[in-house]
Amino acid sequence: MKTSIKTLFAAALTTIILGTASVAANATENNTNYTNLTSVKNISKIKISGNVKLILIQDAKESFEVYDNYFAKNALVQQQNGELRISSFTKEALTVIAHVNNVSSIEASNTSTIQTAGNFNLLDLNVVLNDAATADIKANTVNLSTSINGTSNLVLSGSTESYSAVLGTFAKVGMNDFTASNSNVSTAPVIATYSANRYEDIKVDFLETLF
């Protein structure tokens, strides 16, 4: 398996397929109310919080599409030193389609969701889920690490050479279609009661004044 994975990466990292998944095409065709963040480039880390739906597509041509007029929803999008942060605390999820080339870390908190479209071929990937966040990740990696906290839920598919995981007491991980040459899974200590939304006791009107 080790030989096949390295062969895969040699091909994948040399030539990345530029065709995008159908989920992105459909979203563009069916919804013209979006903002294309063309200035966002070279992103290696993505953090989302609140109620954000993130769809990841591996693409040599990076771009980020934020749907449903995020300015009107007072969502926050920040980029600094290769890290992209997106937050939205409205009842309806803010959808973001991210075309990324070599992301190495993704983190979701509150009730946010992460989904990959198509295959991802990466050397290293770190996935962190907090609160009640969920993720469906399909990737082939050399090193994969996950930290699943609160009541979050992670579904993994694909393969890795080395898998390291920290799993919270109430968190869940599905790995029916996932294989690892080496794995190390540990249980995280219970520190405090999780919150599905850390801002649930703050009124939306107050949050809007912050932006």
Regions found by a protein language model. Give the residues of each.
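Intrinsically disordered, low-complexity terminal regions
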Residues: 1-130, 134-149, 153-211
